[in-house]
A protein has these predicted regions:
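Positively charged n-region of N-terminal signal peptides that target proteins for export
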Residues: 1-4
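Bacterial N-terminal signal peptides
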Residues: 7-15
């Protein structure tokens, strides 16, 4: 009898585990104001089409978590925990793009601004997000591991990625790929004219929050893009920042090249918080919450402004 009772109790504990089972995420998601501010649109989340017509994702994929439960939080009381495991692919509807069958194949759990809405990311904008990678984050041999990107609505080469590589964090640009001389042609992030710049070393990256602030003018002619990391201006680009007649969307989560069988469990976990957006004015971001001053940020310069020659 005691053995049977033990089995029943264990079963109840497993069923109550918040990271067990699957959830349908075909509908858009409204994220809490404690975490996301300024974005008027709702969000979609990567999922996998099933034969019964639902788009499903494991419920460990993302969780709204609380500081009171021991989770890291940058400001306020909550953050978003995202987990990606080996084989987690995205295909939003039958016959659409499939991560698993792509060339090269990929895996993702990623939030994106609702794709069917008119993008608010036009003209001059300001953005922030804060990212926390646990100290025990594994080194995974993946072709790329993206944790935040500014992506075109239609064109398939995102101009700005932030990537984990080994124990370091990099800014990766494909601004050359949207330049008139390379538009609609084969173009890789490794080509001269694009940028791959290390922005955080391992001792700065793991087990602590890192803040990213962006200011851009999204233009198919003379735009600009600036990035601050933990309050320091590290990158400034001047030139085309968006494809003509296209728009820009922000995506965050984990998007990576396929992890193969010889690379352990292949599990990544990352926390996001303070995802903020404002048009034109830095002051609307309320960066004092995070310990920054708009006037201090805007007065900073870099030794070299990046341009496409």
């Amino acid at each position: 009898m005691k053995k049977l009772l033990g089995i029943v109790v264990l079963g109840l504990l497993l069923c109550s585990n918040s990271f067990a089972g699957k959830m349908a995420v075909k509908k858009t998601i409204k994220l809490p104001k404690d975490i996301v501010q300024g974005y008027k649109n709702k969000w979609n989340f990567s999922c996998t089409w099933t034969e019964n017509g639902k788009c499903m994702t494991p419920d460990y994929a993302y969780q709204i978590v609380n500081e009171t439960d021991g989770h890291p939080v940058r400001f306020g009381k909550q953050s978003i925990r995202i987990e990606l495991r080996k084989g987690d692919c995205h295909q939003r509807r039958k016959g659409s793009y499939n991560d698993c069958k792509a060339s090269p194949p990929s895996e993702r759990h990623e939030f994106g601004m609702e794709y069917d809405d008119v993008s608010p990311i036009r003209g001059i904008t300001w953005h922030t997000y804060s990212l926390y990678l646990p100290k025990d984050t594994p080194q995974i041999n993946s072709e790329w591991i993206t944790m935040g990107q500014f992506h075109n609505l239609d064109y398939n080469k995102p101009p700005i990625n932030l990537d984990l590589s080994g124990k370091h964090f990099y800014l990766v640009t494909r601004l050359l790929c949207i330049h008139p001389k390379k538009l609609n042609k084969r173009c890789y992030s490794t080509e001269p004219g694009n940028t791959r710049e290390k922005i955080l070393d391992s001792e700065e990256l793991f087990g602590q929050w890192n803040d990213f602030i962006f200011n851009a003018k999204w233009s198919s002619k003379e735009g600009f893009f600036k990035m601050w990391v933990n309050g320091k201006l590290l990158y400034h680009f001047v030139g085309r920042t968006v494809v003509p007649k296209d728009g820009t969307m922000f995506k965050f989560g984990i998007y990576r090249g396929k992890v193969y069988s010889g690379d352990g469990e292949g599990t990544h976990i990352v926390y996001y918080d303070e995802i903020r957006y404002a048009k034109k004015s830095c002051k609307k971001l309320k960066l004092e919450d995070l310990g920054y001053s708009c006037s201090d940020l805007e007065n900073q310069t870099v030794s070299r402004i990046d341009k496409i020659k």
